Amino acid sequence: SVGLVGSEMCIRDRPTRAEVSDVATAIYEGADAIMLSAESAAGLYPVDAVQTMDNVAIEVESDPTYREIIEASRNARRNSVADGIVSAAREIAETTDIKAISCYTQSGTTALLIAREKPCVPIVAMTSEIETARRLSLTWGTNTVMSGAKQRFKEAVVSAVRGALSEGYASENDQIVITAGVPFNIPGTTNILRVAPCNERMIYSMDPE
């Protein structure tokens, strides 16, 4: 979902209280994105409008109540293997020192399922499909990394780790959770969860091909 704010900042450098409240409420409710339209396209204060939106988002997400509300909103039905995998990924991330959840996704469905769980760590969506990457660009908590098609599990683990490192979510001493599907490169096959070190030497010495 995308939250759309009012248009007061088309002509003024500050929003009304109602507009700030609308933006904050959208974020508290777990909106994937908050959107400006005329304020940035034709308004007199486009930079101020963007900065105001950013400030409100940062303030809301730093509120301890925000996580409580987000966690209380988890009520989706879980009927598939993929549902169970992403739920487990979120629980592992919340109970251990995990820095990110990396998921391989062709259609974008797995990334959306993880975003629905609203984990406390960043989501890194690994995909070889540019259209999928574009669709996921506004998804809650998700950053997309383009990745070539994978044929082997170890190759997929290494690529996911490199994606988390390149985005600054983890260092070599950290761990991430990886979800994927075997056989690779086929939509709807998410069936693997792996907790992986971000040290490639350890991966090559421990992981199967």
Regions found by a protein language model. Give the residues of each.
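Single conserved hydrophobic/aromatic residue that forms the stacking wall/gate
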Residues: S1-G6, C10-I11
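Phosphate-interacting basic helix/loop segments used at nucleotide- and nucleic-acid interfaces
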Residues: G84-I98, V157-G168, D174
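Glycine-rich phosphate-binding active-site loops on the catalytic face of alpha/beta enzymes
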Residues: D22-P46
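Nucleotide-binding motor/catalytic cores of P-loop/tubulin-like NTPases across gene-expression machines
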Residues: T110-L112, K118-E155
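Long, charged amphipathic helices and adjacent flexible linkers at domain junctions
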Residues: M53-R90, M206-E209
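C-terminal binding/interaction regions
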Residues: R162, S171-F184, T189-M202
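C-terminal helical cap(s) of enzyme catalytic domains, especially alpha/beta-barrels
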Residues: S40-D63, I192-V195
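Flexible, glycine/charged-enriched surface loops at secondary-structure junctions
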Residues: S37-A38, G43, S62-S73, K99, ...
